[in-house]
């Protein structure tokens, strides 16, 4: 059997780079919710399309928001 080659999806553009955002605000809950699954997990870079720098900042912001109870740790 031949093995099919994997599909390459469309290259996604980092939304934070487009907006020229220097920081990711942990208080901006509506924006952070876009990068969390319905189970409460943080979306990976290959799915969200963020660059490495902003993915790191986003992860830190989500964890801060969880610690001060702005975002849930798990699904509701």
UniProtKB/Swiss-Prot annotation:
This is Small ribosomal subunit protein bS18. Part of the 30S ribosomal subunit. Forms a tight heterodimer with protein bS6. Gene3D superfamilies: Ribosomal protein S18. It holds the Pfam family Ribosomal_S18. InterPro entries: Ribosomal_bS18, Ribosomal_bS18_CS, Ribosomal_bS18_sf. GO terms for biological process: translation. Keywords: Ribonucleoprotein, Ribosomal protein, RNA-binding, rRNA-binding. GO terms for cellular component: cytosolic small ribosomal subunit. PROSITE patterns: RIBOSOMAL_S18 (PS00057). GO terms for molecular function: small ribosomal subunit rRNA binding; structural constituent of ribosome. It comes from Pelotomaculum thermopropionicum (strain DSM 13744 / JCM 10971 / SI). Binds as a heterodimer with protein bS6 to the central domain of the 16S rRNA, where it helps stabilize the platform of the 30S subunit. The gene is rpsR. Belongs to the bacterial ribosomal protein bS18 family.
């Amino acid at each position: 059997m031949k093995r099919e080659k994997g599909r390459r999806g469309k290259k996604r553009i980092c939304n934070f780079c487009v907006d020229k955002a220097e920081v990711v605000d942990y208080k901006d809950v509506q924006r952070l919710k876009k990068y969390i699954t319905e189970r409460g997990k943080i979306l990976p870079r290959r799915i969200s399309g963020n660059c490495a720098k902003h993915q790191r900042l986003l992860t830190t912001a989500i964890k801060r928001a969880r610690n001060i109870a702005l975002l849930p740790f798990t699904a509701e």
